[in-house]
Amino acid sequence: MRDEIRQQPAALERTLRQEIKNVEKLKKRLEKNPPRMIVLAARGTSDNAALFGRYLLEIATGIPVSLAAPSIFTLYGASLRCQDALFVAISQSGESTDTNLVLERAKEQGALTIGITNEAESSLAKLAEHAFLVRAGREKSVAATKTYTGQMLMAYLLAYALGAKIKLDDLK
């Protein structure tokens, strides 16, 4: 675990350097059609990163942010009106069944969808309209370190794409 903690700065730099073009592309799309609300879906450690993202996004953008309750979709089969909403699924592996289902249902209901994952070939990366990779490499420790801080960095980049006054140079 100590090695993975020490690898975080390089993983964050790699994520920032390789994902910035994708973030700029999303920023242009959002400038034309900004969301009225944001919904974050995640489980486990990723859910903790989503909670951080909620505070950051609401404070930095003024857009209301909610944390998804996947059982609304998985257990109760409810359909939500998702037009003009941005749904963001966060998953280290990209294979969290209920997180992916939330994104799939939101997409069916007209939401713009984003996936944040460490796995380029994951179901989440393929399902989301915009997939952002936390380029942390393989995480051997049970306690997610590199992927967790990478997900937090992606929350900053999402805030930037939504028009927050964040200077990318400050993230380097």
Regions found by a protein language model. Name each.
Residues 1-36:
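An N-terminal, well-structured beta->alpha segment
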Residues 22, 31-170:
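Glycine-rich phosphate-binding loops that contact phosphosugars or nucleotide phosphates
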